[in-house]
From Swiss-Prot:
Protein name (Swiss-Prot/TrEMBL): Cathelicidin-2
Cross-referenced PROSITE patterns: CATHELICIDINS_1, CATHELICIDINS_2
Residue ranges, annotated region (Disordered): 135-176
InterPro entries (alphabetical): Cathelicidin-like (IPR001894), Cathelicidin_CS (IPR018216), Cystatin_sf (IPR046350)
Modified residues (Proline amide): P173
Subcellular location: Secreted
Keywords: Amidation, Antibiotic, Antimicrobial, Disulfide bond, Pyrrolidone carboxylic acid, Repeat, Secreted, Signal
Ranges of biased composition (kind: Pro residues): 141-176
Stored Gene3D superfamilies: 3.10.450.10
Function according to Swiss-Prot or TrEMBL: Binds to the lipid A moiety of bacterial lipipolysaccharides (LPS), a glycolipid present in the outer membrane of all Gram-negative bacteria. Potent antimicrobial activity.
Originating organism: Ovis aries
Protein family (similarity comment): Belongs to the cathelicidin family.
Chief location: secreted
A molecular function (GO) term: lipopolysaccharide binding
Amino acid sequence: METQGASLSLGRWSLWLLLLGLVLPSASAQALSYREAVLRAVGQLNERSSEANLYRLLELDPAPNDEVDPGTRKPVSFTVKETVCPRTTQQPPEECDFKENGLVKQCVGTVTLDPSNDQFDINCNELQSVRFRPPIRRPPIRPPFRPPFRPPVRPPIRPPFRPPFRPPIGPFPGRR
């Protein structure tokens, strides 16, 4: 009797563990990584863009450390750069080379990690183009000439002038 009860209890536990094992991997497999969510947002930015060329992810700021539900919005910050591929191409932006002196944009906003909920709110602003200019060679700046420091010379201190002692000539009063 005890063995039947124990096997029934073991059967229930195995059923619960099996169900739990089936539910958890499917939920975690569906969630996108932070980088994948940003790449999807870049793809949608390219689709909605009216510019001639595609943009590709140039730099991704670190993900926030908080673990949240995949359906909630996560703040993102990244930089994209213009590629050589025209927007009409079917080629993924990751396979396109960056355009030399292409536009660079800083993007901030929110994305969700849930692939079924493709919501994102991203705003991109063009960064000032920073072009490399070789440094101008100028002669080194020399400080103005200053002679080495010398303390002021003081004349020696002399005692006040006293005439030399001369014994008196002649009889001295009080002496005989």
